[in-house]
Amino acid sequence: AVDGRQIFIEPWGNTALIGTTDDDTYADLDDLPVTTDEVRYLVEGVEQVVPRVREARIVGTTVGARPTLYKYGPTEDALSREHEIVDHAKDGARGLYSLLGGKLASYRMFAQEAADLIAPKLGNHAPCTTHSSPLPGGDRPADIDLLAARFELSRFAVERLVTRHGSRAETILADSGRRGRMVVCSHEPVLACEVRWAAKHEYARTLLDVARRTNLAMGACGGNDCALAGAVIAGEELGWSPGEVRAQAAELLRSRQRSRLPAIGDKQARAEAMTMAALRTLGR
């Protein structure tokens, strides 16, 4: 990057992820902002090695809060990514523990350390098996070509399904008929049976939940081609009324629009908002 920090470019399905930035935040964790300056910072950094990067279209931005261990003075990127378990017995609160810091790459080790500390205090002295237990769908490899032929799907569609669900992809497909194998979002792609699976087995209760589990609307279409279709399918499983189906689709579209606004800049974002307001007025 322009200030010497590292930037990563990672392939992700039909797109590439570019990141990351670090900044202190005091915002609502349910509504964290992405700034235009952060987008420009990343694009300028990548431009040094990919000169034509500005010709690519930014389809969205993503943000999250990382609970790094606090230390006064260092810049955000210099803060430790280590984790720590605090026993609050010393504060007079026996049985209360805080898990601080850490990151996604070490979450299972962090969980094992917490279990090894707390379980014996509850009378459970069995050894922790987290380190040897496969994640859901990670018990065995899936044969993509065999699944594509068996269920009459494109290899790409099956490959993306396996990427998201591993060996569970076969179960998801086997539970569906031909209608269930319909492609809902062609940019990812996401199948109808995958939307149903998220609602039935993965505790999805909103269309945004479905999107987070399947990548519905997260690609180039931004939900324009698939939000309503996805809402109809999820609604059949979750018992939504027609009005709730429309409301869920609208909320997903609003979410995807918010993720794109930092990429087009503040002034253009305001112009887009004015255009949308004018269109709504004309449509009345």
Model-derived features with residue positions:
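Low-complexity, small/polar and acidic-rich linker and loop segments
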Residues: 240-284
